[in-house]
C-alpha cells in the first residue's frame, strides 16, 4: 500500500467519523487549481481542520435519558461531563478535567479528588470494594504528583445488607489506608430501601500535598515522554469480568488493586 493510499483511507475514515455539521461549509471545498499530486495532501489537511473544529465545538448530549454508557468512562461519559457538569460548574480548577484538581490553601499546593465505587461483585479475588475505594482515590492523587494525606468516605447501604460484610469492607479500607499512609478523617452513611441499591456503594474523596514545582497531568504530556506502568494492564478489569461470568474462559487472576506511590 502506498503512502497516497494510506492518506486516502485515513481521510475517508475521518470524514465519515466527524459529522459535517461541525464544519464551516464555506471553507470545506478544495482549491480550484490544486497542483498535480497534492489533492490528497490538501484533503487530509482539510480533514484535520475539521477535526479541530469539532473539538472546539460545544459538546452536546443527544440522549434524553442517562444510559450505562454515560458511566463507562468513554466518549458518552466525556460528553456528559462537558455538556452538563462542566458547563454548569466551570472554573479554572475544574476545566483541565484531570484526575485531581490543583488548588491552593495559602502558600500550600494541594491536589483534591473524589471517586465513587459501584463495583459488582463487592468481593473479588485480590480485594473488595473497600480497598478499591481507598486505592483508587489515593492513586488519583499520586499520579497528579501529590503525596496523599487525608480521605473522606461515604457509604450508601441497602436495607438488609449483612453487617459482617460491612465489617469486612471497612477492615480492608483501614488496612489499605494504613498501607498508603493516609488517614480517613470524615465520612457519611445513608441507607436506602431494599431493592433500591446494590448492597453497598462507596464514595471517597482525597487531599494530597504537592511539593516543589511538580506539575503532572495529561495537559503536560509531550511526544517522547515515558509512560510508566506499575504492573500488568487489565488484571483488575478482567478479574471482575470473570467473577461476573462475562467471559467464556477460565483463568486464575486476581485484582491488582494497590497504591502506586
Question: Language model features by range: what are they?
Answer:
Residues 2-261:
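Helix-biased detector of long, well-ordered alpha-helical tracts
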Amino acid at each position: 500500500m502506498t503512502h497516497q493510499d494510506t492518506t486516502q483511507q485515513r481521510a475517508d475514515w475521518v470524514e465519515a467519523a466527524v459529522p459535517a455539521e461541525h464544519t464551516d461549509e464555506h471553507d470545506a471545498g478544495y482549491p480550484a487549481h490544486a497542483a498535480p499530486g497534492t489533492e490528497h495532501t490538501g484533503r487530509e489537511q482539510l480533514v484535520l481542520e475539521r477535526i479541530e473544529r469539532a473539538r472546539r465545538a460545544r459538546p452536546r448530549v443527544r440522549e434524553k435519558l442517562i444510559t450505562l454508557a454515560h458511566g463507562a468512562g468513554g466518549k458518552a461519559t466525556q460528553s456528559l461531563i462537558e455538556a452538563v457538569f462542566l458547563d454548569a460548574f466551570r472554573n479554572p480548577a475544574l476545566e483541565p478535567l484531570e484526575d485531581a484538581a490543583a488548588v491552593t490553601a495559602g502558600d500550600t499546593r494541594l491536589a483534591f479528588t473524589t471517586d465513587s465505587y459501584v463495583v459488582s461483585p463487592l468481593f473479588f479475588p485480590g480485594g473488595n470494594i473497600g480497598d478499591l475505594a481507598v486505592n483508587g482515590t489515593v492513586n488519583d492523587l499520586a499520579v497528579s504528583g501529590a503525596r496523599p494525606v487525608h480521605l473522606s468516605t461515604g457509604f450508601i447501604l441497602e436495607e438488609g445488607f449483612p453487617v459482617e460484610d460491612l465489617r469486612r469492607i471497612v477492615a480492608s479500607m483501614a488496612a489499605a489506608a494504613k498501607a498508603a499512609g493516609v488517614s480517613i478523617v470524615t465520612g457519611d452513611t445513608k441507607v436506602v430501601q431494599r431493592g433500591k441499591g446494590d448492597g453497598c456503594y462507596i464514595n471517597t474523596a482525597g487531599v494530597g500535598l504537592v511539593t516543589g514545582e511538580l506539575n503532572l497531568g495529561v495537559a503536560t504530556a509531550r511526544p517522547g515522554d515515558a509512560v510508566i506502568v506499575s504492573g500488568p494492564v487489565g488484571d483488575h478489569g478482567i478479574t471482575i469480568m470473570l467473577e461476573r461470568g462475562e467471559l467464556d474462559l477460565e483463568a486464575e487472576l486476581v485484582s491488582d488493586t494497590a497504591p502506586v506511590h
